[in-house]
């Protein structure tokens, strides 16, 4: 039986815009090894700054833990267009190789170059058209997943369920259409490198 590989993890580098996480990269990696994981991906919130520290520690532990793998990723904010008052959906990207990491850097640079302030916070989204354009040159080198409850798939599915519970079939259909459009976009953009994130939870939603 294959051991678990954690594909969605945050470190203190996710605090670049707001307080989000207290994990130091070294501590997170050590804990993953202690738990018997086969590896983890570092996916901070629109931040690649921790990757150098992660790589340095990966080299340090390579001899003692040769089978433990560390992947480098980014949790981006994916939107249809940049405008105030929108939902900034979370989306996970993980580099499969050095070429994929170059794609992550290009996407992150695009997001930060076009940053703006909305509701008192600096926002750093990337649009779907920008993501699709960049990935047209890097397909096969980046893994994508739907992320957490902050992702578009989870949000739309949750809202569809709420609409169905009150028999609001019009809204439910709209959320269903949103899910279909989102899934088609992801499959077209990432092909077989697109995955749906599943997370255990005791929360009712």
Question: Where are the regions a protein language model picked out?
Answer:
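Phosphodiester-processing cores and adjacent nucleic acid-binding clamps
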Residues: 1-205
């Amino acid at each position: 039986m294959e051991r678990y590989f954690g594909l969605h993890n945050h470190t203190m580098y996710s605090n670049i815009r707001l307080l989000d996480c207290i994990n130091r990269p070294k501590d997170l990696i050590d804990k993953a090894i202690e738990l018997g994981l086969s590896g983890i991906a570092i996916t901070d919130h629109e931040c690649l700054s921790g990757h150098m520290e992660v790589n340095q520690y990966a080299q340090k532990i390579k001899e003692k833990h040769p089978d433990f793998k560390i992947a480098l990723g980014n949790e981006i904010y994916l939107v249809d267009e940049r405008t105030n008052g929108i939902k900034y959906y979370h989306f996970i990207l993980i580099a499969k190789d050095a070429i994929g990491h170059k794609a992550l850097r290009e996407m992150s640079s695009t997001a930060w170059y076009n940053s703006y302030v909305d509701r008192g916070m600096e926002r750093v989204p990337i649009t779907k058209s920008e993501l699709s354009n960049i990935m047209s040159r890097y397909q096969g080198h980046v893994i994508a997943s739907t992320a957490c409850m902050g992702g578009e798939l989870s949000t739309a599915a949750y809202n569809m369920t709420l609409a169905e519970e009150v028999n609001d079939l019009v809204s439910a259909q709209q959320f269903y259409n949103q899910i279909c459009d989102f899934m088609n976009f992801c499959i077209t953009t990432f092909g077989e490198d697109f995955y749906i994130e599943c997370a255990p939870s005791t929360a009712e939603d």
